[in-house]
Amino acid sequence: MASSFPIYELTSNGDVVLTLRFTRLRVSSAILSTASPVFREMFGPNFLVGQNLYSPRNPKEIPLPEDDSNAMMRLCYLLHHQRDPSDSSPLNVSSTQGAKEFLTMAELADKYGCSHSVNMVSAEPLSYFADPSAINAGTSIEALLHLIAAMYVLDDRRQFARFTG
């Protein structure tokens, strides 16, 4: 049952609850609509989901069981300019696992059409890894390959060129 899953409140005036496989996220439809044309359509009048008015008192639950819970959580925290309190570094991509999770989030951003928003936030932290000395600093080749794939998925041509140049 979805209600037994934890709910993460990204904003106190969230009017939508995204119900994922293992968690629920209370988010702002306005923020997601601004960042994503897919969410804009989903929350608009042409979809059943968007035909009812939302309110923070009675947030609308939207099931997204096919999306990766961790990736959607990271993406929503990023779009809401919030930091997951349980995660010391939301863009910790120096480990192979962190880079793989970033790639999964990038694929989700691509799915929802908000790659540009991720690019703006991730450019500075990722620029460190475009330097060849990153390999000497302990970043694995596998982690770098995940990051290169993420830059490709995000259509971040500048970072992709830096990573592969």
What are these model-predicted stretches?
Residues Y54-I62, E66-R74:
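Eukaryotic helix-linker segments that join adjacent hydrophobic helices
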Residues Y77-G165:
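Post-BTB helical module
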Residues S33-F43:
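Short active-site loop/helix that positions an aromatic residue
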